[in-house]
C-alpha cells in the first residue's frame, strides 16, 4: 500500500484545486518556508478524521476553509481526497485503489466519502486500524509531535507502540465485547428478578 495522490481544494492556503501525485517509493514534499508543506500534512490528517482544530493549527474547524486574500474571495468549502494503492490488500476492502475524501462547508455541514460513497468517520477509522495511517497514526508526524511523544506520558507512548505493532483493533474489539457482556449480564439479572417476582 502506498499513497498515490492527494487532491486539495479550498483547504487553508490552497484556493485552487491542486493534485499531488506520488510514484511508488519514498516521497517527500519540500519547499521554502511558507509554501504550504505543513498545510499538505494538515490536509492528510484532516481527511483521515482529525476533529481538533487545534491539531490543525486553527481556532475552529471552519479555519481550514480558504479565507480569502486581498485579491481572492473566501471559498465556501474545503475538500481533500487521498488515493491509496491497495493492490497488496493491506486495507480490509476489496478494491485495488481506495479514495477517502472529506468535505466541509462554512455552514458546518461535512461529509466523508469512501470511493465516492458517503460513509461515517467510524468507517474511515476502522479501515485504517493497525495500519499506522489513521489521524493519530505514526505515519504522519506534525510539527512538534516528536517532542510531544518524547515528553509524553508512558500510556501515550504505549498507545503509539500498540498502533505500530498492530494490536489496537484487537484491544478495541475486546473493549466492545466486554461492554456487551456487561450489558447482557445486567439484562440477565433483570430477567431473573422478573422471574422471581412471577414465581411468588
Predicted regions and their residues:
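Gly/Lys-enriched N-terminal cap/neck module of very large, oligomeric protein machines
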Residues: 2-200
Amino acid at each position: 500500500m502506498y499513497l498515490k495522490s492527494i487532491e486539495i481544494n479550498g483547504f487553508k492556503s490552497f484556493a485552487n484545486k491542486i493534485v499531488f501525485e506520488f510514484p511508488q517509493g519514498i516521497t517527500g514534499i519540500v519547499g521554502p518556508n511558507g509554501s504550504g508543506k505543513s498545510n499538505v500534512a494538515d490536509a492528510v490528517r484532516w481527511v483521515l478524521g482529525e476533529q481538533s482544530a487545534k491539531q490543525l493549527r486553527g481556532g475552529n474547524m471552519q479555519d481550514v476553509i480558504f479565507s480569502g486574500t486581498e485579491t481572492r474571495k473566501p471559498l465556501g468549502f474545503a475538500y481533500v481526497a487521498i488515493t491509496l494503492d491497495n493492490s497488496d490488500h493491506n486495507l480490509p476492502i476489496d478494491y485495488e485503489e481506495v479514495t477517502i475524501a472529506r468535505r466541509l462547508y462554512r455552514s458546518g455541514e461535512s461529509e466523508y466519502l469512501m470511493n465516492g460513497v458517503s460513509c461515517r468517520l467510524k468507517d474511515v477509522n476502522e479501515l485504517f486500524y493497525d495500519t499506522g495511517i489513521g489521524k493519530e497514526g505514526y505515519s504522519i508526524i506534525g510539527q512538534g509531535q516528536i517532542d510531544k511523544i518524547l515528553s509524553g506520558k508512558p500510556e501515550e507512548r504505549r498507545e503509539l507502540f500498540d498502533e505500530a505493532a498492530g494490536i489496537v483493533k484487537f484491544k478495541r474489539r475486546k473493549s466492545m465485547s466486554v461492554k456487551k457482556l456487561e450489558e447482557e449480564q445486567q439484562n440477565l439479572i433483570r430477567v431473573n428478578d422478573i422471574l422471581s417476582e412471577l414465581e411468588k
